[in-house]
Amino acid sequence: WNQGAPSIMARWNPIQGSVESLQDQWNQEGIAFKECLHDWSAPHRLFELKSPKGSPADSESFQQGKYYIQDPSTLLAVHLLDPQPTESILDACAAPGGKTAALSSLMQNQGTLHATDPDPVRLKRLQSNLHRLGIQNVRSGENLTQLGQASKAPSYDGILVDAPCSNTGVMRRRLDVRWRLSTSEIQTCCEQQSALLES
């Protein structure tokens, strides 16, 4: 159960060029690709990748920020939120930045997007990813205080909370979960999720 190697899925980043130029570059790099269609996503956004030269993440197109390796399932909440270029959005528990980047893409790199994560190591990874992807409408910090929002109650048009979870939904990519997950860890996740929603 869930023992097979998962597919490598990619989300095109329109901030760094057209999908046609990305596909041309994939062809030059020897990366085979197939479009993945979902009724909730616009065409030409999601692709399954296969590379004969190792990981697609080692490719120049990835380093240039033209795409982000990301499961389609992680994007559904982003599309349900439906952020607009004129809106103010909060992405809580944002690292490593996949959903933040997808939010920015739908906002056309405009509007106001605040991204927070309490883990400084993960926060640096988020900032590195956003820089690679050419995203400019994001302010990030460990909490709202770092974003200068402590003295006033911030008002957002939408809030995305990707709360800490058990990872049972991504066992194909996190094989260690089946061996390390415990009842107490699930209970801790529930408490953290409740605290986040109440805040």
For the regions a protein language model found, what residue spans apply to each?
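S-adenosylmethionine
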Residues: 1-199
